[in-house]
């Protein structure tokens, strides 16, 4: 409680600042083993996010602003769900996916055009028919996954696709490169076959397209563990972001962290009793 007049006089006499008032000494979130989160931003691809989570053995990844504040959250389950949904051929354009990210995800590189541009319109197609048949299903601004036939590449350029992806590391002819350059068509070369490319390509979309940004359940480092247990039980998440005093996200905690909390150590002096001491001294 508040210091009495005698104590205040002695402290003033010797120029000592009075100790801070402490009403509760219970275990807090900052006393838990907070799992520090690796740096992750909303522009990174799902594949990069997945790799980061695997490397750090985590199931939830906080997405942060440049100043460290929490912007969203993505889980392994979110990524797996997107990976399994392979029927949406417009996914990459709706997610405004960068060509460079696409190239990285399929282990390739941009060999023609501006890799920093974005795929914002059209669907993804695998070209398996002859050039005449392509006219029936390939539309302007589509992204086409193709093999090594020059006539197919030329037909795709004639139909004004936005991007051509060539598999198996096959070299594209100078004629194709020249025409693609004239029409601002991106060409990406990948060492993988068309089947593998079509399986991997959805992982190139940016994290921001699927991350959760609303109704996030977070805890503060100053929160008492007694207060957060019921919240954790109510929301059956695998991990919860932790925010420090400066409003920055520093990591995550889970229910398992209750097993290894670092309880505060207290020394009672002046014949003090527990029932006369600060709240939660026995916790």
Q: PLM features: what roles do these ranges have?
A:
Residues 2-17:
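N-terminal beta-loop-helix "entrance" segment that forms/cooperates
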Residues 4-7, 171-178, 274:
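Short, glycine/polar-rich helix-capping loops at beta-to-alpha or helix-loop-helix junctions
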Residues 19-21, 61-62, 144-146, 162-168, ...:
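Short hydrophobic alpha-helical runs that function as membrane-insertion/retention elements
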Residues 20-52, 64, 99-111, 119-150, ...:
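Bateman/CBS regulatory modules and CBS-like beta-alpha motifs in cytosolic regions of diverse proteins
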Residues 32, 53, 61-77, 232, ...:
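A glycine-centered beta-loop-beta connector
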Residues 76-92, 257-266:
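A short, polar/charged loop-to-alpha-helix boundary motif
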Residues 89, 177, 182-212:
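Long, charge-dense
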């Amino acid at each position: 409680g508040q210091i009495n007049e005698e104590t205040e006089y002695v402290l003033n006499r010797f120029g000592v600042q009075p100790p801070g008032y402490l009403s509760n000494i219970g275990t807090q979130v900052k006393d838990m083993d907070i799992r520090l989160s690796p740096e992750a931003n909303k522009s990174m691809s799902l594949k990069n996010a997945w790799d980061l989570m695997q490397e750090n053995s985590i199931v939830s990844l906080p997405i942060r602003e440049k100043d460290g504040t929490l912007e969203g959250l993505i889980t392994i389950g979110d990524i797996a769900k997107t990976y399994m949904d392979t029927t949406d051929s417009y996914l990459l354009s709706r997610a405004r996916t960068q060509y460079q990210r696409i190239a990285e995800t399929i282990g390739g590189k941009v060999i023609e055009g501006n890799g920093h541009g974005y795929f914002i319109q059209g669907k993804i197609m695998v070209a398996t028919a002859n050039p005449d048949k392509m006219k029936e299903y390939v539309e302007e601004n589509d992204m086409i996954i193709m093999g090594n036939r020059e006539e197919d590449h030329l037909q795709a350029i004639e139909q004004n696709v936005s991007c051509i992806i060539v598999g198996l590391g096959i070299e594209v002819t100078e004629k194709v490169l020249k025409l693609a350059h004239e029409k601002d068509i991106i060409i990406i070369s990948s060492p993988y076959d068309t089947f593998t490319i079509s399986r991997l390509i959805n992982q190139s979309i940016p994290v921001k397209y699927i991350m959760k940004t609303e109704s996030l359940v977070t805890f503060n480092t100053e929160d008492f563990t007694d207060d957060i247990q019921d919240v954790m039980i109510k929301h059956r998440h695998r991990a919860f972001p932790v925010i420090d005093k400066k409003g920055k996200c520093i990591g995550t905690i889970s229910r398992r962290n209750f097993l290894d909390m670092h309880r505060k150590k207290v020394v009672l002096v002046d014949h003090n009793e527990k029932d006369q001491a600060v709240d939660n001294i026995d916790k």
